[in-house]
Regions:
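Outer-membrane beta-barrel channels and translocator barrels
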Residues: 362, 405, 449, 453, ...
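Transmembrane beta-strand segments of outer-membrane beta-barrel domains in Gram-negative
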Residues: 779-883
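Beta/coil-rich, acidic/histidine-enriched accessory regions frequently appended to metallopeptidases
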Residues: 26-32, 36, 45-47, 246-348, ...
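Blade-terminus and WD-like Trp-Asp/Gly-His loop motifs, strongest in beta-propeller folds
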Residues: 305-313, 356-365, 402-410, 446-454, ...
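Active-site-proximal alpha-helical
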Residues: 79, 173-195, 199-260
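A flexible loop/linker signature enriched in serine peptidases of the S9 family
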Residues: 195, 298-299, 317-327, 344-352, ...
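Juxtacatalytic substrate-recognition/specificity segment
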Residues: 23-167, 174, 191-192, 253
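Outer-membrane beta-barrel initiation region
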Residues: 640-773, 843-867
Length: 883
């Protein structure tokens, strides 16, 4: 039985109301709350050491670490050129196998220092935390983002702790400045982000940059820096960065270098992009499908929208600050039902990969994949009785996408295991999976054909041959459409598209050899239909055929399609798009696609034989020439039987009519030749020899310094009853120094506080071990205070306390804590005259235990401003062990 947070709060409040307790003098102005990280497994770290950097990884992540090591050097040097600033310190790349593992880490766990007026200075380091999301393209983008962040911080705040303290005190940069510059340098912006930028520019959302938050601020900054690079040259960016650091002012950086104020630059870049986007949208058409009246809130991110095979129901998922909700929507009644709510709203990197959803072909159920307590779960929801069945999926790290077979007995998965994204066939009976591909290339978005005998998917593989763990010579930065024959299990795939500079996604197979997918060919992501066909290549002793694809655009919309689902057996499909500051939901039937193709052919709109868009407004690198229609020739031999070459017909061939010329882009080498594509459009891995893996040894570095004026005690502490003089220690200085290990699993904090009169002083040292789920802390504390017990005499109280605490997190916002402590108090009556000099000191000893329930889901909105709720319930027991 699960107790909701609301019910637990009501229970605790009732108990507090019913209890009759005697108040005691307690220092309550400082109460420790804080979020938690929940470790469901142990991390045993190893490392590769190089001259410029070190790469750290754990079990199951060696392939990721090797990839990181091979591409890190070229990315470091590339970003050094962008910022015109060298990396002087060795960078530590810390690789996590998945986003879920990264959320278990202790990276970024801090106390409540944000409430201190003096603030905390975070020491700039050279650590780069990266995690694998199933796609090596995104993985390398995250790597570049981390390197860019290190370079920007070093450039602005300096390389040693003295420069850091000075710069962080005087320089406060907005999110759009830092995060936008990181996105620009790393080029970690996909088509969905481009669509949001286009929408925000056209609706005027970027006119007040400093009011933007989160990803909107980052996208706005990316657009501004891209405009500056295109208008004034990329080499001007390091100068702006340098002047901002020297002058300690954002405005001055632009004014000194460009001679224009930030307001002027903002108006110019908005006008520039409005012109670009306006010209792009002139030949676009509006979506004419049935639109569902689904209301969404502006602060939520929609990640999934899928119509049922019968078109009666739909599922969509929204996400806000990492918390996602899954809704079932009735198309006829317009009502919705919340099926699932998971995770908590926290200021962290959101994970948009879950839940992964697939409709059962009967339309009476759907299956979704989620993560629960470190486990990968498949859950099936039945629409008839509203019940959900769950089962754990073993051996896989993450599921990226999945679709049901026409029979409903199997699922095809794109899943991650040990740094590889491959295609799996999952059997509902037996809860087992069969691996269909096994190589370093990424395989995504699989779906079954109408008869269930073929699997269509996208991949960045350079050729059409399946190999078991081939040497990673190159990794494609594009995705092409491939088909796999389930009956023959042939290692030779059918290549449907060959576009070195484009990414196709969400492919499905129609009737026969017709396919549909999404692609960004004319500046926006639209639907396409492709026909796979063959023709005679040449005749010698045998007849040789070449296979090619003719593709047509089905849509020419002004906004990108974010999610696309097709049910080949019923023809129902759904689209999710973002336009006019709102997510929009559409559905239709593929029976109308033929008409759409004829219209596109007759009017010449979006035909793929036209010149592709090569100047998408804010891409740093323009697209090279690419033809979605083209496919490498592939020859196939047939028998020597006599054939009339002037009048022939393939068996079982549909009667297609083609109105466009088919051109051969490139020849595929013969089977005994090695396939070596050009470096254009591919990531060529460095061939540097990798050293042997070493075990990680714990070492500490300074990570924060706190210095402030303060009038509170340093911790939760019972004060000796000494009259009004002991209410607070008086205004004085407080200094804390914190060190932590590389992974922030071990922390040591030392500090002292001195009152202005030097009558009161406090010293403390604390050590924490956060490596396991149960966090451990030991704290030593000394406090000395002086007061007048009767207005004439002076007394001094010296307290020593040692405490040991265990904290067990139930989730990221709720924890159970238990402490044991021993305290020694000595009351000294100072010898101010001959009468009180002989007075002996009073000695007190206390031993105690404390239990706490702590809840904290607050979000910082600014200094001493929080949104959310935090509460604590605790009980204590003390005794004198000497009596």
């Amino acid at each position: 039985m699960q107790i909701s947070t609301r019910h637990l709060i009501l229970l605790v409040s009732s108990l507090l109301w019913a209890l009759s307790t005697n108040g005691q003098f307690y220092q309550g102005s400082y109460q420790e709350f804080g979020k938690n990280r929940v470790q469901y497994k142990d991390f045993l770290w190893q490392q590769f050491r190089f001259q410029e950097f070190d790469t750290y990884f754990y079990e199951g992540g060696q392939e990721l670490a090797e990839f990181t090591s091979r591409v890190a050097s070229k990315n470091i040097h590339s970003l050094e050129e962008v910022f015109d600033y060298p990396v002087r310190d060795k960078i530590q790349f810390i690789v996590y196998n998945s986003h879920s593992d990264f959320k278990m880490s202790n990276v970024g766990i801090n106390g409540d220092d944000e409430g201190n007026i003096g603030g905390t200075t975070q020491i700039v380091g050279s650590k780069v935390f990266i995690y694998f999301e199933g796609d090596y393209i995104k993985f390398e983008q995250n790597l570049r983002k981390g390197i860019a962040r290190v370079l920007i911080n070093k450039r602005l705040y300096g390389g040693n702790w003295r420069d850091v303290i000075k710069s962080s005190t005087l320089l406060n940069l907005p999110d759009w400045y830092i995060e936008g510059l990181i996105l620009y340098a790393s080029q970690a912006v996909d088509d969905d982000a481009q669509n949001i930028i286009r929408n925000d520019v056209m609706t005027g959302a970027y006119e007040k940059l400093n009011r933007l938050e989160g990803r909107n601020a980052a996208f706005a900054g990316y657009a501004l820096w891209s405009y500056i690079a295109r208008t004034y040259g990329e080499n001007i960016i390091p100068n702006i960065l340098y002047m901002s650091g020297v002058s300690r002012n954002v405005e001055s950086g632009f004014l000194f270098v460009l001679g224009k104020s930030l307001d002027t630059i903002t108006k110019e870049f908005i006008a520039y992009y409005r012109g670009e986007y306006g010209s792009m949208s002139m030949d676009k058409t509006a979506i004419s499908l049935d639109k569902l009246d689904i209301k969404t809130k502006g602060d939520r991110v929609l990640t999934t929208f899928k119509i049922s095979p019968d078109g009666r129901h739909a599922i969509y998922v929204d996400n806000i600050l990492g918390q996602y909700r899954l809704y079932l929507y009735d198309v006829l009644s317009g009502k919705r039902k919340k099926i699932l709510k998971a995770e908590h709203k926290l200021l962290r990197i959101p994970d948009f990969s879950f839940p992964v959803i697939a409709w059962h072909p009967s339309s009476g159920a759907f299956t979704y994949a989620k993560e629960w307590r470190g486990k990968l779960m498949l859950c099936t929801y039945n629409l008839d009785d509203g019940k959900t069945t769950e089962r754990e999926v073993f051996t896989l790290d993450e599921i990226l996408s999945m679709k049901y077979s026409p029979s409903g007995q199997q699922l095809v998965l794109s899943a991650v295991d040990n740094g590889q994204t491959d295609i799996y066939l999952y059997y509902n009976i037996g809860n087992r999976q069969e691996r269909l591909t096994d190589d370093v290339f990424g395989d995504f978005d699989p779906s079954f054909s109408k008869d269930g005998n073929r699997i269509v998917f996208t991949s960045n593989r350079p050729d059409d041959t399946l190999r078991t763990k081939p040497e990673p010579i190159v990794l494609g930065q594009n995705r092409d459409v491939f088909a796999y024959d389930l009956k023959s299990r042939s290692p030779y795939l059918e290549r449907i598209t060959d576009t070195p500079d484009l990414i196709e996604k969400d492919p499905y197979q129609y009737e026969g050899r017709q396919y549909t997918f999404l692609a960004d060919y004319k500046g926006t992501t639209n639907r396409y239909v492709a026909v796979y066909d063959s023709a005679i290549s040449r005749i010698d002793t045998t007849i040789h055929y070449r296979f090619f694809t003719v593709a047509e655009p089905l849509t020419n919309y002004n906004s990108d399609l974010l999610d696309y689902t097709v049910h080949p057996n019923t023809g129902e499909f759904s689209l999710l798009t973002y336009a006019d500051n709102d997510y929009q939901f559409y559905h239709g039937n593929t029976s109308n696609d033929g008409a759409a193709t004829r219209v596109a052919t007759e009017e010449g709109e979006g035909g793929l034989s036209e010149e592709p868009i090569t100047n998408r407004p804010i891409r740093r690198e323009s697209l090279e020439e690419a033809e979605l229609t083209f496919l490498p020739d592939k020859e196939e031999e047939h028998s020597d039987q006599e054939i009339n070459i002037n009048n022939y017909k393939f068996e079982g061939e549909p009667d297609y009519t083609y109105e466009r010329e088919t051109i051969t882009l490139m020849e595929v080498p013969s089977d005994n030749e090695e396939y070596r594509p050009s470096e254009q459009g591919y990531t060529v891995l460095d061939t540097l020899p990798l050293p042997g893996a070493r075990n990680y040894n714990v070492n500490f570095t300074t990570d924060k310094i706190l210095a402030q004026l303060d009038n509170t005690f340093m911790g939760e502490f019972y004060q000796p009853l000494s009259g009004p003089d002991g209410l607070n220690p008086g205004l004085g200085g407080l200094v804390k120094l914190g060190v932590s290990d590389l992974f922030e699993d071990y922390k040591i904090v030392g500090g002292f506080g001195l009152a202005g009169s030097f009558d009161n002083n406090t010293f403390m040292v604390m050590a924490e071990d956060l490596t396991r789920r149960t966090d451990r802390r030991i704290q030593l504390f000394r406090q000395q205070s002086r007061f007048s017990p009767n207005g004439f005499n002076l007394a001094e109280n010296v307290t020593y306390q040692a405490a040991y605490r265990l904290s067990y997190p139930l989730n990221e916002v709720f924890s159970i804590r238990g402490s044991g402590m021993y305290r020694f108090d000595e009351l000294i009556l100072l010898a101010t005259d001959q009468f009180n000099a002989p007075t002996p000191n009073e000695i007190s000893n206390y031993a105690g235990v404390k239990g706490e329930l702590v809840f904290d889901n607050t979000l910082p909105m600014g200094l001493n401003l929080r949104r959310g709720m935090r509460w604590k319930v605790w009980g204590e027991y003390y005794m004198d062990p000497t009596n």
